[in-house]
Amino acid sequence: MSIKEEAAKMKLASPLMASASAEKRNSALLHMIENLEAGKEKIFAANRIDLAAAKASGLPPAVMKRLAFDEGKLADSISGIRQLISLPDPVGKVTLARQLDEGLRLYRVTCPIGVIAMIFEARPDAMIQISSLAVKSGNCAILKGGKETKETNRVLFSILHEASTSANLPSEALFQAEQHSEIDELLTCRESVDLIIPRGSNTFVQHIMSRTNIPVMGHADGICHIYVDKDYDMAKAIPIVIDAKTQYTAACNAAETLLVHRDIAKDFLPVLEKAAGEKNIHLRGTKEAGEIIPLNIIENDDFRHEYLDLVLAVKIVSGVEEAIDHINRYGSHHTDAIITENINTAARFMQLVDSAGVYQNASTRFADGFRYGFGAEVGISTGKLHARGPVGLEGLLSYKYKLFGKGHIVEDYACHKKDFHFKEL
């Protein structure tokens, strides 16, 4: 059966999935946890095969790190599912209740989007995140992972699909597309697929966006900044910068650029250089920064580069206004932070930086659905429509309007036989 036919079947099954009870959906999530724990050795064995093949093909360390699925990532994935179970049912939530006239009541109610296609590179934990979020939110999900983790993805999908069906959810709730050739066909399934969420490199995401008329939610780059203001606290600044760069260098929310106020550069940069050296961080930057500490000189256009490695670009700026201008010009609208004790400067930075996440005195690595208490995330959206930032349950929901009347007709209001009497319920 072709991917187009599978998507059509899922579209027909999506109302059944949307109407499944919260108890049934949570039961499926519990089965996912049980199956993942019971099948972990099988998962790890499959992942070792993928890692060996990736190493033989010469994939870079940053990609290898994303490919790996170990005890730590399994534990994080299971924690995310447990958190999802603990969250209230997001489906059927009334967000507006209004009486339009006597006996005429309007309600706005949350509902699943329908059929979501998740196309991702490298990260096998994305398979677990999107499957669990889809089940909790009552959506059907088509999952297409990268060839680099085909063995891991195959085992994970088998485990997750069995958990879903064992809770009596529709068998069409989850589907795995395994062939690369299926992607182009999937991108044409406008009548069956409601949303595409790509996760991967800039080139990959741009490729998806340019080849489909289906709505796409996601981000193409993770060029995150930290600006150290003149009113900074050294005891906070250094640990934040080091954490944002090294806690997980291959993550899209890792810091790539450090902006430093000119007034404190001579005091701050030598301390940074020492801390960076201890963590094997390679510093690059402008000529002005290079006059204070040793680093490789780069040009302005190089600040558009996402390193995903132990590399940090450094630039000295005149103040918060230049920092804001640089971030909005060279950034990717993902997550950017300011280190300052001045609440007015922080407020201006957070108001004018055009990013999905703006932080004061905190690491950019906090930009994550699990750390936001969403349970898990399908990705981070840098767009402004529908969802922005880490996309959890709410980003996978739409809404519908339910109107209850007693024989009401518009003509009565058009000819002023009746008048609207709006009242919140």
Regions found by a protein language model. Give the residues of each.
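Solvent-exposed alpha-helices and their adjacent loops that cap or buttress functional pockets
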Residues: 97-98, 107-112, 135, 166-170, ...
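Residue-level signal for inorganic ion chemistry
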Residues: 21, 25, 138, 196, ...
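N-terminal Rossmann-like NAD(P)+-binding subdomain of aldehyde/semialdehyde dehydrogenases
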Residues: 1-105, 133
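C-terminal core of ALDH-fold dehydrogenases
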Residues: 27, 325-425
